[in-house]
Amino acid sequence: MIAPPGGTDWRRLHPLTPLVRFGRLILAVALITVPYLESSRSPRGKFELFYPVLVWAALIGLGTIGAIVSWAVTRWRIEGADLRIESGFIRRQSVRIPLSRIQAVDIVAPLIARVLGLAEVRVVSAGRGGEHGRLAYLTAQEAPAVRARLLALAHGLSAETPEPPAVPLLHVDNGRLIAGLSMRAHVLVPLAVMVVAIVSAVIAPGPGVAALGSVLTIVVGAGVALVRAFNEDFDFSINEAGDGLRLDRGLLQRRHETIPFGRIQAVRLMQPLLWRPFGWWRLEVDVARQHAPRDGSDQGGGQQARTLVPVAPRAHVLWVLARVFPDAGIAPPAGAEPPARALLKAPLSYHYLAAWYGNRYVYARTGRVQQATVVVPLAKIQSLRLRQGPVQRWLRLATLDVDTAGRRWGASARCRDEAEVQRMLWELTERARLARHAPAPSAMATAVAPA
């Protein structure tokens, strides 16, 4: 087939794509069927096992045929100024992604795909409501080449332009990662409840044993969450390139993601209570329109796409913060604390509340058990909202919410003097307007990494 001017010929996905897509179902069927094999030793057991196995075999056969047909009718090419992907047998679908709208190109390699030497190329574009263009699957050697080609064309360069080099910023130690994840509240609280339940079962065997079963389910759930988080953030590394920050992570499913600097709406520095003796912090980013695909294939990526540093010492976190938001400091100046009467409204968190702003960023600090500081560039502010409940009105206090184009969270100046909030509302509105018309600072300035 002759390619159009500026385009390429139609290309298909790798022939082993159906095996990767249907491999999970085959494994699930195997795990369900194995327990029934024990009953097949008796003649009656063999008869009872025959029909379930037949049904599962039929489902696997139909699924395999469907996966093969889906692969056969899926093709893609670069057509002019668009990436075009056609798929579907009964319901034909043709997706066109303008190359100029591409914001990031990620590479995802699930376990089965990695074993077979395959990887998925996931194209994130603006204005698609969280949907991604997916090329699943290509060879592990072809995927980076396709990624480099798409990024070059998206930036108006020649298709043969190599991918810009990346500078290593930070690698998260896996030992510190598992220790930090284990000291989170959603892990320790179920374990503490489990200990109490065991003691209760020893003291009062009747009701205590009954409660132990329910608690055990909660503990297992916490363990699964811990293993999943470790699996997703294993061997976490951050690299910096001209197109943004590149994140490499994952144990079973390896992910190579890119977060463009321009899409970062806000950052949040967090420190759980039990991390404080070790000086560990966590850094998260809120990215505009960063959603998981509708088919759920992201494997938790909707949450992990906003994790920039899972756990690291304070100096390392501030180093990465400086690469994202240059000249952003998180030390509150004098007068950043709320008035003393705010202690009546927020007695537990009063000593951690603070809010301030400068020429480029607005800051808000909150927290009781877990400290959190949010940094929002003035140029990213979408709206400002003043909130004042009945208790706040009685105390002459108010809260100012700073909204961005992100989907996760924003900054909140809580329990401030109502006159101060009115002044902040006017000043931040004017500063945000000026910041949107000012040239953006470069995040690629030369710097020295912390020791």
What residue spans do the PLM features occupy?
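N-terminal basic, Ser/Thr-rich segments that initiate or prime the first beta/alpha elements at protein or domain
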Residues: 1-451
